[in-house]
Each structure stands twice: as structure tokens, then as C-alpha cells.
């Protein structure tokens, strides 16, 4: 579902691990249905959840029936809070909202019809609705359309624990402020690889924590 604007011419330790594994997005069947009658639309997950201090990826994709102009001038923008809310990111300027300075990355390549918005160092105040908007030049003029329901981001507090795991596995995506990946391979494949790597790292944490707990219990057994 999308709105079109057309302009002619233009344990404590284990609990923490499980909480991290719960971060992600829910693609509900009725979240963003294709509207083939109109032939254009934007697809986003219905809900995403993350942990304070962590990061979250909001995937998006879009489709359209028009023939692109020689210079399509394709760009992606994101709004938050409501459909007519403030713009937090615009790839054509580039622009990034003060609230998200140094914390937003758009993994999208010019000409591609899918990508990912990554929010780093999540804050409680980031909890809101997020809407992606597409802008391009077609042979029929400038076309602009946006997701209507958007994606609801829920941010949960990290668990405060006194017990620390002796094993720490970190997965970090380094960036300096705003990054617009205009010279990369297919971002969907790159994001899939990153998600698989992060999942394997989290599974490794669980295995190591369980192993450490079993080792401690074995050490504490009375000698016969």
C-alpha cells in the first residue's frame, strides 16, 4: 500500500543473549500487500524490535510500472512518527536528522529497488513509526510515493546484570556519520550475509556460555 504523488514534467547472561536474538523484524502477511491494480507500491515489515544500545535493520523494497527517464534521479527518503512526519534521511541531499546524527546508514545502491535502513546505537526515543519514500523521474514526469502503514519500531531496555560472561563476541559495522553506498554490489545479498554472520556469532555466544556453565558445575562437584 502506497500513496502516489505525480508531478508532470518533473541466566542473566543467557537472558541477555536471548534478548539480543529477539531483535528483528516481523513480516506480517497483511503488512504491505502488493497493489497490482495501481502497479506501484512500497514494502516494509509491519514491526521491528531492537535493544537499547544495539542496532536494527529495516528492509524496504518498491515497484512501479513506469519507464524510467534517461536520468531517473532516483532517491530514497525516510520519515518517522507519522505519515506526514519529519524527514530523518534523504539520499539526494544528503540529509540526516539531528536526532540520528552518526547513527543512520542507508544500504541502497542507485537504481536498485530494495535496500536497508540501519539505525545504530538505539535509544528509547527512537521508538516510533518509520516510512520510506521513493522519488524518481519517469518518461511521464516526476513520480513520488510512500509507504502508508510504515514500520513500527519497538525499543526494549537492555538487561542490567551483575553476572558477566567470560566470552564476548562483538559484531560491529563501522561508519562515520551518514553512509550512502552507491558503488557496491547487490545490497540485499550483502545484508543477508551480514545477518547470517551476526546470527552465527550469537549462536556461538550461546554455545560458549552453556559450555562455561557446564564447566563451572563440573569444577564445583565434590571429589569422590
UniProtKB/Swiss-Prot annotation:
<keyword id="KW-0472">Membrane</keyword>
<keyword id="KW-0325">Glycoprotein</keyword>
<keyword id="KW-1133">Transmembrane helix</keyword>
<feature type="glycosylation site" description="N-linked (GlcNAc...) asparagine">
    <location>
        <position position="107"/>
    </location>
</feature>
<dbReference type="InterPro" id="IPR013783">
    <property type="entry name" value="Ig-like_fold"/>
</dbReference>
<comment type="subunit">
    <text>Interacts with CD99. Probably associates with DAP12.</text>
</comment>
<feature type="topological domain" description="Extracellular">
    <location>
        <begin position="29"/>
        <end position="195"/>
    </location>
</feature>
<feature type="signal peptide">
    <location>
        <begin position="1"/>
        <end position="28"/>
    </location>
</feature>
<dbReference type="GO" id="GO:0001773">
    <property type="term" value="P:myeloid dendritic cell activation"/>
</dbReference>
<feature type="glycosylation site" description="N-linked (GlcNAc...) asparagine">
    <location>
        <position position="154"/>
    </location>
</feature>
<dbReference type="GO" id="GO:0005886">
    <property type="term" value="C:plasma membrane"/>
</dbReference>
<keyword id="KW-0812">Transmembrane</keyword>
<comment type="function">
    <text>Paired receptors consist of highly related activating and inhibitory receptors and are widely involved in the regulation of the immune system. PILRB is thought to act as a cellular signaling activating receptor that associates with ITAM-bearing adapter molecules on the cell surface. Seems to associate with DAP12 and is a receptor for CD99. May be involved in target cell recognition by natural killer cells and in activation of dendritic cells.</text>
</comment>
<dbReference type="InterPro" id="IPR036179">
    <property type="entry name" value="Ig-like_dom_sf"/>
</dbReference>
<feature type="transmembrane region" description="Helical">
    <location>
        <begin position="196"/>
        <end position="216"/>
    </location>
</feature>
<feature type="topological domain" description="Cytoplasmic">
    <location>
        <begin position="217"/>
        <end position="224"/>
    </location>
</feature>
<dbReference type="InterPro" id="IPR051694">
    <property type="entry name" value="Immunoregulatory_rcpt-like"/>
</dbReference>
<keyword id="KW-0732">Signal</keyword>
<dbReference type="GO" id="GO:0045671">
    <property type="term" value="P:negative regulation of osteoclast differentiation"/>
</dbReference>
<dbReference type="GO" id="GO:0042288">
    <property type="term" value="F:MHC class I protein binding"/>
</dbReference>
<protein>
    <recommendedName>
        <fullName>Paired immunoglobulin-like type 2 receptor beta</fullName>
    </recommendedName>
</protein>
<feature type="glycosylation site" description="N-linked (GlcNAc...) asparagine">
    <location>
        <position position="90"/>
    </location>
</feature>
Amino acid at each position: 500500500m502506497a500513496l502516489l504523488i505525480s508531478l508532470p514534467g518533473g541466566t542473566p547472561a543467557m537472558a541477555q543473549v536471548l534478548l539480543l536474538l529477539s531483535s528483528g523484524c516481523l513480516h506480517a502477511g497483511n503488512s504491505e500487500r502488493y497493489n497490482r491494480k495501481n502497479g506501484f507500491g512500497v514494502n516494509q515489515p509491519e514491526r521491528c524490535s531492537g535493544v537499547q544500545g544495539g542496532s536494527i535493520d529495516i528492509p524496504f523494497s518498491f515497484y512501479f510500472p513506469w519507464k524510467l527517464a534517461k536520468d531517473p534521479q532516483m532517491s530514497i527518503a525516510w520519515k518517522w512518527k507519522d505519515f506526514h512526519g519529519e524527514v530523518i534521511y534523504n539520499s539526494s541531499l544528503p540529509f540526516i536528522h539531528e536526532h540520528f546524527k552518526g547513527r543512520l546508514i542507508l544500504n541502497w545502491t542507485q537504481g536498485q529497488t530494495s535496500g536497508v535502513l540501519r539505525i545504530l546505537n538505539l535509544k528509547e526515543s527512537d521508538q516510533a513509526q518509520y516510512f520510506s519514500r521513493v522519488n524518481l523521474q519517469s518518461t511521464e514526469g516526476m513520480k513520488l510515493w510512500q509507504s502508508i502503514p510504515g514500520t513500527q519500531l519497538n525499543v526494549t531496555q537492555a538487561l542490567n546484570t551483575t553476572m558477566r560472561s567470560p566470552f564476548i563476541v562483538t559484531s560491529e559495522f563501522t561508519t562515520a556519520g551518514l553512509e550512502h553506498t552507491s558503488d557496491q554490489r547487490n545490497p540485499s545479498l550483502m545484508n543477508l550475509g551480514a545477518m547470517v554472520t551476526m546470527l552465527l556469532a550469537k549462536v556461538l555466544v550461546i554455545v560458549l556460555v552453556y559450555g562455561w556453565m557446564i564447566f563451572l558445575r563440573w569444577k564445583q562437584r565434590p571429589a569422590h
